[in-house]
Amino acid sequence: MPYKIFVTRSIPDAGIKLLQANKNVSLDIYERDQQIPRKELLRRVRGADIILSILTERMDKEVMDAAGPQLKMIANYAVGFDNVDVKEAARRKIVVTNTPHERV
């Protein structure tokens, strides 16, 4: 069964192509270059194994609850991770990463 990855905003095509090349990945991408409305974020993360987020989206307990217990990783497409509740993620054994160079 493929990993479900939800991408919270448009990222460079090279990154999307890299993810699409993996046959073990099912992608759901919020295709707009603006912040996803919170209600839509909570709906679309359901069942995600991985959330690829942008710094403007809060990755907190509410998002982790909405995603479900199978959530394994929050990959932040940003230099930092101030938007992620790292303590809550650690409690759930969810890996949190960032991209210090922000280039694909």
Regions found by a protein language model. Give the residues of each.
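N-terminal glycine-/charge-rich "phosphate-binding" loop or analogous flexible N-terminal tail
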Residues: 1-48
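Phosphate/diphosphate ligand-binding glycine-rich loop within oxidoreductases
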Residues: 48-104
